[in-house]
């Protein structure tokens, strides 16, 4: 299995934990959906396997509307053909899949005052479900999604949800999923008042030292963390293009 096959298999496994189903939608176009996480867009998208047409896009929009959804998301490994993109006014985002193919984690600087706890070995549910930092209008949705993740993490030993504490305060969290020689790291978050204190790298090094396999993550091509990841030894192994439309 090459590195991209392994990463794709790990991604599919992670989605399956949350009930995401993949099925053919039209020729050259697959659909992924999940009824388990109603507030999550990530597990509901269309995935072309060939160049898509305006008709494909319209069919996907019609399908989403029939399901009572107000958006459509296409995720692909090539840019969308400009006439298709411009006909509908998609918002575009580019994501990099970055993998640590040669382990350099021993060189990462950490913060020795940070205590890291894993849902697999600690009762940290209250800390993980704390949504006080989320804007009030989004708290209910955030809590529901976190509770679903917590339920999966508590019943699947390969799924790690880590909490970083300093002086008794939760200052950061991250997910990690082990699957057949690959480890996906996702949703690295550090409390705003505690940033630039090596908390993120402390969480990442903990994952590298306590899991087995090639560590990989997804980084926004337009954001600065990708540059930090590159300095840490992560390499871009795939570029993913996302096209989002809401009505």
Where are these regions (language model features)?
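Short amphipathic alpha-helix that is part of the acyltransferase structural core
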Residues: 1-14, 44-51, 96, 104-147, ...
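N-terminal charged segments
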Residues: 1-67, 144, 152-155
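Conserved acetyl-CoA binding element of GNAT-fold acetyltransferases
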Residues: 39-49, 181-192
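Acyl-donor-binding surface of acyltransferase catalytic domains
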Residues: 50-115, 120, 225, 243-245
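Conserved hydrophobic beta-strand within the GNAT/NAT acetyltransferase core sheet
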Residues: 74, 185, 215-220
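A conserved beta-strand-loop-helix scaffold within acyl/acetyltransferase catalytic domains
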Residues: 141-189
């Amino acid at each position: 299995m090459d590195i991209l096959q392994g990463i794709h298999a790990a991604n599919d496994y992670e989605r399956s934990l949350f009930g995401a189903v993949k099925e053919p939608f039209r020729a050259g176009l697959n659909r992924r959906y999940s009824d388990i996480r109603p507030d999550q867009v990530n597990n509901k998208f269309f995935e072309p396997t060939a160049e898509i047409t305006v008709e494909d896009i319209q069919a996907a929009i019609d399908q989403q509307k029939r399901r009572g959804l107000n958006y459509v998301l296409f995720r692909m490994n090539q840019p969308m053909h400009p006439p298709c993109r411009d006909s509908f006014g998609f918002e575009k985002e580019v994501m990099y899949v970055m993998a640590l193919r040669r382990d350099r984690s021993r060189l990462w600087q950490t913060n020795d005052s940070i205590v890291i706890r894993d849902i697999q070995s600690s009762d940290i549910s209250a800390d993980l479900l704390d949504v006080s930092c989320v804007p009030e209008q989004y708290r209910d949705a955030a809590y529901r999604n976190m509770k679903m993740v917590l339920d999966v993490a508590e019943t699947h030993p390969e799924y790690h949800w880590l909490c970083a504490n300093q002086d008794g305060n939760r200052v950061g969290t991250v997910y990690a999923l082990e699957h057949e020689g690959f480890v996906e790291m996702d949703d690295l978050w550090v409390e705003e008042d505690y940033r630039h204190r090596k908390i993120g790298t402390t969480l990442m090094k903990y994952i590298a030292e306590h899991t087995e396999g090639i560590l990989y993550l997804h980084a926004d091509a337009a954001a600065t963390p990708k540059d930090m990841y590159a300095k840490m030894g992560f390499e871009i192994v795939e570029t993913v293009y996302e096209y989002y439309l809401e009505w």
